[in-house]
């Protein structure tokens, strides 16, 4: 199977090149047979890449250490599950995995459009095959072929990084890859529109769900990565502004901007050049994320890179795509003129445009902070780093403005908002926000940034709740339905709008959790068995932690484990027993680095987070006297962290609702009173239109 996979990878390249040529020539000559053949080559490339992927997995399962990739990321002791996920554990396999997902989405796109939208499909097939060809060239000629063999066969492999042997890391990278590759479809349709000259909103209509799908996978993938960092890395946080973390955030930010700005083109026929530029930028940032992870130019705990040849190939590809698309946009400028103009600063168009500027400002700050160490080293020859303080200082005010816009955008009028519109829609939400601010201040909340954030969260939630209430009440009155039934029908009759509101709720929940970090408690204690320490929560209650002792297992119970030391801590809250937490140090056979496993007690209100920072005597801990060992214990109390994960679920739910096709418009009520209440389009600060 492995040999078959290697042959399949080599065959895929000429097939892809042939399909690329057929697509462009078919679009130019309008030859239907050429177009059909181009589409069939996409099916063929997908099949061949699946065979190649199965070949790599077969090599992992068969412990074929004659292959460099298998020897580098597996060993005989590794569990079968992690051998299968070894396909995307390293640079070579992850590039192949990327290509096979891209081929899958390309196949799905061609299949769904086999009998419609034929004016776009020749060039769509050509663009998709161009990108597939690029990845195949990288795999075969950039020293990253997963089927490369060693000069000798080692007795065993090096094994997978223990930090990657975690369930979150088995789903975090694939989810991000799904998000990155799914955005290739909107990009392909945008380029097809530039090539065939159909530059109305049709290409946006055809790709809207693809954009949402990509946005959803990126958002969920980022949250999965945050969860992995929180549970596995053992430093007490979930986001460190690591270069590769930033690289995954960048296309999500620009895709969010794109989801807002396309509404202006759909509604008013404006921002056509802007939208073309945003779809190009977002696609390039998905490639940039791949480049950054695999080029070796910037150090990261996530980076797979070993060779720099791949960096130059990626840079050349991105430069070529950028130049070609800019030339196409310039060529089509006469057809990309706006049909209307901005009539007032106080309008939904202005709110969306300002939202775009803030998102792009956020993205630029992240991008510049990420690449600045590389630029500075190239200019001065000295290595520097840009840490979390820079990103947080620059991006917090931008993020707060975006949160405010999440409350303004959904209800402000198109074209020009009147004084009555502003008063009607914002008087109650602003009052609620101010009331929350005063109440929190009187309750003792004195951290200014957190106080402002929570007040704005209350403002946005009130806007959304008011919209749901007005729509439900109107439908219940007009259709004679109960409120629960009316709410259900309200959402299902316009999933795109109300799904967007639900996404807003998820975003607000995540902001709420982020603001809670202002009240984190962080204490470190040296403890001997039997010692107790009291930790006061930001909410006023007291945790009493008792260190019960250290237990050591020498390679028992888990493959590839040399030893593990488990510190047991009993937890009481205001004198009431709350259970036992454990935190560990682990030493793996294939790694000299000690790994930390944290203990977490999570509630809706706060997380109690324990880290075994150090043991008094590691050698002594491995002896019979391990139970008497002293430890350094780091204790953190982190308010509202669970709301990040809850917010992620709500965000995903809202996006799925927005993705789902709405009920046929012919089945909707056409009563003017109901339509007036329920058909205004929403803004989505987090994503769903």
Task: Annotate each predicted stretch with a short phrase.
Residues 1-689:
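Solvent-exposed, non-transmembrane regions of integral membrane proteins
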